[in-house]
Amino acid sequence: MQSYSIPFHSISEGGKQFSQLFLDYTSNTLATDALISQFYQHDYRNPAHLSAQIQTVSGRTYQRPELVLELTRQNQLFGSGPKTFERIQSLLSKKTLAVVTGQQVGFLTGPVYTIYKTLSAIVLTEKWHEHYPDFEFVPVFWLESEDHDYEEISHVSLLKGNSLERFSYSEASYQALSSAGATQITPEFLDWLGKEILEAFPESDYKQKMLTLVRESYKEGVSYEMAFATLLARLFYDEGLIIVSSHPKGFKTLAKSVFIRELETFPASSQNIIAQSARLEESGYDAQAKPRPINLYFFQENQRLKIEPRRQGSVELLPGKTTFSQHEMLEFAHSAPELFSPNVVLRPIVQDTVLPTVAYVAGPGEISYFGQFLRNYQFFNIPMPIIYPRASLSLLEPKISRVFEKSARILNEKEISGSLSRFYQNSQQFINELLLAASTVDIEDEATTAIQGLSDIFKKFGLKLSEIDPTLAQSVEKVMQSTLNQVENLKSKTIKAEKQRHNDLIAQIEKSRDNLLPGGVLQERVLNGFHFFNKFDTTLIKLLKELLLTKAFDKHLIVPL
């Protein structure tokens, strides 16, 4: 499978696509060295750091038997494949380590970068096992389902023709402040899914397969989280992917030590984040994660409520007026840890307390978050994982490839890589460059030269004929004028054709922009994976995996299909 790579900093079409922190993190420059040394525990580029992390994590004690039981139970519910259960069992050994990634539980797995994150984790486990054959590395996908931002997950974006369509659903039964992933699928949702989204899939050789895949995952009465996990398990059935939900009591029990320490020591973890964030901002970067005095939520009547400290050792649940003493909250943490939910600041700490995490595969925004978390890892006495950038891709459908092949010919280039690079940098400037190169003939100049030449020929011819018969000169004049009029007509037709040719080219580039940068945003952040699976089958996942096994993840990859 062929691919072309573009440095992240070169992608500026549609505005700045990446934060400065992410650009520095992936640029392999002195800025990268300075950033990583100050704000991260490990350098993802350095094999010595991976070796050290392997030794550190394998030497720690985890609740492995209990973890294996919980992961087995969950993945049986999700319908995971046999290889997944082999890998879960391998976690009983200290020599089995996790490469973790995760995402919110969006409809139909959300934007296609969810697929790329998952593939990135799988690819790293295979690469690292080759280099460290005495250790097993297992890919783990963390379901981020407890967030109560329903709007964040309740939509699907597809291309209909060349127009971006965003399909959103508002669940009438959704209770404000409840976990979005726990929302139950209703008959109304299934009706919307069938009529709005599945009907939007263009006819293809794989449409029926895709419809079956979705319908077998999204069923009445199951939660959004369960539907997401079931679909993800089917897509990666043969890859040994372990999927984990942090919501069940069995998992929360493994994490209760974090809840207890947070409640006993608040606002210490927030102060750690604030101090680290201040250093980050002094270095010219933005601090994105906002800590709270207590970085936990509390479930009450299915609502995920903030825990706010009050005077005299009490806490209040917000919104609302329920109060508990600090002692009562600690009792809950010991006896009913499922009532607690970490916020963005504490979630990684929970994750890496329970899982033997050697690395976390992160998107650009997550990499920025982790830059604020180093002190908190130290505070909770947990090794911070290697923060590895996920693979970033744009898929080039055949019709789009042909546009760039045509562009390359106009620009006299052997490959499309140059055209792609200039397109992602500034599409309008790229169009102007194409028009200049395409207009190889100056019609006005050529027509003027032809008219002048023909006029000279006819005048000489008229002079010769007038020597024989002076009246013939008038006939020559008429023929000349008719001929010159024909040249003028040809000039007008040529100019019109040239303009039309340019208009077609411009239209093709703009259609390409709708596909590669829908809404001015990178394709991977907008389009759902089923836009591609419906056209190219889910075997596309295996093809992309084979490609990524040969690539680093330090540039944006353009992949012709």
Swiss-Prot record:
<keyword id="KW-0175">Coiled coil</keyword>
<protein>
    <recommendedName>
        <fullName>Putative cysteine ligase BshC</fullName>
        <ecNumber>6.-.-.-</ecNumber>
    </recommendedName>
</protein>
<dbReference type="Pfam" id="PF10079">
    <property type="entry name" value="Rossmann-like_BshC"/>
</dbReference>
<dbReference type="Pfam" id="PF24850">
    <property type="entry name" value="CC_BshC"/>
</dbReference>
<keyword id="KW-0436">Ligase</keyword>
<dbReference type="InterPro" id="IPR011199">
    <property type="entry name" value="Bacillithiol_biosynth_BshC"/>
</dbReference>
<dbReference type="InterPro" id="IPR055398">
    <property type="entry name" value="Rossmann-like_BshC"/>
</dbReference>
<feature type="coiled-coil region">
    <location>
        <begin position="472"/>
        <end position="517"/>
    </location>
</feature>
<dbReference type="InterPro" id="IPR055399">
    <property type="entry name" value="CC_BshC"/>
</dbReference>
<dbReference type="GO" id="GO:0016874">
    <property type="term" value="F:ligase activity"/>
</dbReference>
<comment type="similarity">
    <text>Belongs to the BshC family.</text>
</comment>
